[in-house]
Amino acid sequence: MPELGSLLLSTQAVAAPGELLNLALHAGTVGPEAAVLVAMIATLLVDLAGEKVSVRWVPPICYAGLGSALVLLALQWNAPLEPSFLGAFLSDHLAIAFRAVVALSTLLSLLISWRYAEQSGTPVGEYAAILLAATLGGMLLCGATDLVSVFVSLETLSVASYLLSGYMKRDARSSEAALKYLLVGSAAAAVFLYGASLLYGLSGSTSLEVIGNALVTSPTPLAALALVFVLATVAFKIAAVPFHQWTPDVYEGSPTPVVAFLSVGSKAAGFALALRLLVGCFGSFDTQWKLLFTVLAILSMTLGNVVALAQTSMKRMLAYSSIGQAGFVMIGLVCGTEDGFAAMVLYMATYLFMNLGAFACIILFSIRTGSDRISDYAGLYQKDPLITLGLSLCLLSLGGIPPMLGFFGKIYLFFAGWADHQYVLVVVGLVTSVISIYYYIGVIKMMVVKEPQEASEVVKAYPPINWSTMGLPPLRVALVLCVLVTAVGGILSNPLFEWASSTVAGTPLLQQAIATSSGASLG
């Protein structure tokens, strides 16, 4: 992307001195993040007025902030590409798409959070403010193009995630989850800093573009060591095997709405980071990191889906499922082709709705029964057809059953992998998809097939449904929206893939990598 740096310099050369700072910053680029920041500050101020005021005003403030962020992101889609903050942030199409996924995942997570927070006695204002802080870090991470901005945004996301994981202070499992997450996350941050220091020493710059150019001209063993450290950090963030050990315990112990955000928003930011660092910095080590990611993808798909078979907790099952889903997304990353990158973007967008829809059903069941055990879902169809239908459709979509949206997301990934001769990845993906269908359908069978007399004791004591209870209408909106998109979105798979392809086309970083890869293949 040499044209980006020259764009900034040439623009500055013709500007008046008083305008140089504004031209160098291009602060309007981070307008969506500013909207989230204003909403976060407003929730903290409202929280000072007491819990009653918070319960009334915090939700609309969050909706306004996140809604404004999504609108501003849409307006940026066809805007001229300008590096901002002295080249530390770039709002290309890749950044816009992944920032939208992060913001939308937060919005849906908040919709399914209010009733859960009220029932558990969680202060609404503090919870929303910390979740918005995590969102801010995730969105900035998606567009960060400098080691300093990468680290600051990564730690903003991470520290807020630690706080969210341990937010249920009276729950020993939540505290344990937060401690494990903190220890492993701190180690990952230290590893990243060491890798970043090596990159700075090799290039004399913190700019990812400059670092990438320096590594092309003089690849060294130290650069390979830096690649290992950076790859370990990325693998931790996306919960890829063998850096996944924290995931099941954190998912099981954390508040369920927090898990919903971590499974989508945090993972999306992690994949955006992977693209920025691996494709942007380590183009000269393309063969090496793709080989490593091939191994990680195979391990993640295999272990995630096989271990999920033995789980008795719904959240632990979805934790291992998310590890397997990360393996599927890595197929697109390893391909490095236009179709591969587009399929990767598309699958993250589809994963947003089908996974959050599943978590909305789990939260609703937990609110009414206090249970997370899979066996307690037996016979649920007799008592709550809405949860049964919603959870069934979302699980079928996660398994890749046609005509659900998840089927088209996976099929595009497999097509891209096959076209790029990644036959082993595609075969492993197909086999592990079949395995995942087995445990997803096992849950559906338990809910639907069981006779009334075979229903679990929890379902037999299922309370009457009252949707007018405070906090339940937003949850119902999120549930219905996710289920509808998951079930009907398959009809729109071609327009969605065209949108994902335009995301790749509007990202100079990916276009340069595709051109380089094509040139090497022809050579």
Swiss-Prot record:
Give the residue spans that cross the bilayer. Answer: 30-50, 57-77, 94-114, 128-148, 182-202, 223-243, 255-275, 291-311, 317-337, 345-365, 389-409, 424-444, 477-497
EC number(s) from the headed UniProt entry: 7.1.1.-
InterPro entries tied to this protein: NADH-Q_OxRdtase_suN/2, ND/Mrp_TM
On whether Membrane is a keyword of this UniProt record, the answer is yes
Q: Which residues form a coiled coil?
A: none
Give the top-rank taxon of the lineage listed in the UniProt record for this protein. Bacteria
How would you classify this enzyme at the top EC level?
translocase
Q: Where in the cell is it found?
A: Cellular thylakoid membrane
Q: Which UniProt keywords apply?
A: Membrane, NAD, NADP, Plastoquinone, Quinone, Thylakoid, Translocase, Transmembrane, Transmembrane helix, Transport
Q: How does it sit in the membrane?
A: Multi-pass membrane protein
Reaction catalysed?
A: a plastoquinone + NADH + (n+1) H(+)(in) = a plastoquinol + NAD(+) + n H(+)(out); a plastoquinone + NADPH + (n+1) H(+)(in) = a plastoquinol + NADP(+) + n H(+)(out)
> Quick one: a GO biological-process term for this protein?
ATP synthesis coupled electron transport
Q: Name one GO cellular component term.
A: plasma membrane-derived thylakoid membrane
Any one GO MF term held by the record is: quinone binding
Q: Enumerate the NCBIfam families for this protein.
A: NDH_I_N, PRK02504.1
> What job does the chain carry out?
NDH-1 shuttles electrons from an unknown electron donor, via FMN and iron-sulfur (Fe-S) centers, to quinones in the respiratory and/or the photosynthetic chain. The immediate electron acceptor for the enzyme in this species is believed to be plastoquinone. Couples the redox reaction to proton translocation, and thus conserves the redox energy in a proton gradient. Cyanobacterial NDH-1 also plays a role in inorganic carbon-concentration.
Subunit details: NDH-1 can be composed of about 15 different subunits; different subcomplexes with different compositions have been identified which probably have different functions.
Family stated for the protein in its record = Belongs to the complex I subunit 2 family.
Q: What protein does this entry describe?
A: NAD(P)H-quinone oxidoreductase subunit 2
Provide the taxonomic classification: Bacteria, Bacillati, Cyanobacteriota, Cyanophyceae, Synechococcales
From the UniProt record, report the name of the gene that encodes this protein.
ndhB
